[in-house]
């Protein structure tokens, strides 16, 4: 296949898995459990972070106008904020969830598995950032929809993470809190540093 055709297939596959995770998480987690754990970075997380950044960049330019260097600087700052918060939040959440598995649930230390889980579980955050980047008026609705991540994590906890049924609710709540809070905390710190450094 040509390189262009392969890229089109990759983009289609990314959106297919994202839509499946949102519409039918159990079936999506079954498919994900069969794939290479390291594939999550290049096949899903990095492209989704890139799309989130692009969406916010375009939305910021549209909101602030195209004229002047200030509008471009603002758009770049917003783009970096989203990319840094999602990237750092993803790795921080994965690290903390792995620690949670080891300490609270007496499971093996398995960073690649947890990175795969966290990457795909963040699908709700990724999709909302893409939509809010272009349509910022939906921020309140997005805040409420953010908690759909709990259902995605609930399904993934049994299928991919193999959490025992008795521990599943506790794992789901704690993991969901980490997946929502870690990017938010990093975004807050990034914003404060941006203000201080300007």
Regions found by a protein language model. Name each.
Residues 12-109:
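Selected alpha-helical membrane-embedding segments in polytopic membrane proteins
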Residues 98-184:
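Hydrophobic alpha-helical transmembrane segments and adjacent short intramembrane/lumenal linkers
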Residues 184-198:
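Juxtamembrane boundary at the C-terminal end of a transmembrane helix
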Residues 52-53, 57, 179-185:
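Hydrophobic core of alpha-helical transmembrane segments in multi-pass integral membrane proteins
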Residues 1-11:
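Single conserved hydrophobic/aromatic residue that forms the stacking wall/gate
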């Amino acid at each position: 296949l040509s390189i262009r055709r392969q890229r089109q297939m990759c983009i289609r596959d990314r959106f297919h898995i994202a839509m499946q995770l949102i519409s039918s998480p159990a079936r999506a987690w079954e498919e994900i459990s069969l794939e290479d754990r390291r594939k999550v970075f290049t096949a899903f997380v990095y492209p989704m972070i890139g799309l989130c950044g692009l969406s916010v960049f375009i939305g910021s330019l549209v909101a602030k106008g195209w004229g002047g260097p200030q509008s471009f600087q603002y758009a770049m700052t917003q783009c970096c904020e989203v990319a840094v918060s999602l990237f750092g939040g993803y790795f921080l959440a994965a690290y903390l969830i792995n620690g949670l598995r080891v300490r609270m649930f007496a499971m093996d230390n398995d960073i690649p598995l947890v990175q795969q889980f966290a990457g795909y579980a963040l699908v709700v955050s990724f999709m909302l950032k893409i939509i809010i980047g272009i349509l910022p008026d939906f921020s309140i609705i997005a805040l409420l929809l953010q908690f759909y991540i709990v259902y995605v994590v609930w399904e993934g906890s049994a299928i991919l993470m193999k959490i025992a049924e008795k521990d599943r609710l506790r794992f789901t709540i704690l993991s969901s809190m980490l997946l929502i809070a870690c990017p938010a905390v990093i975004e807050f710190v990034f914003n404060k540093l941006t203000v201080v450094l300007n």
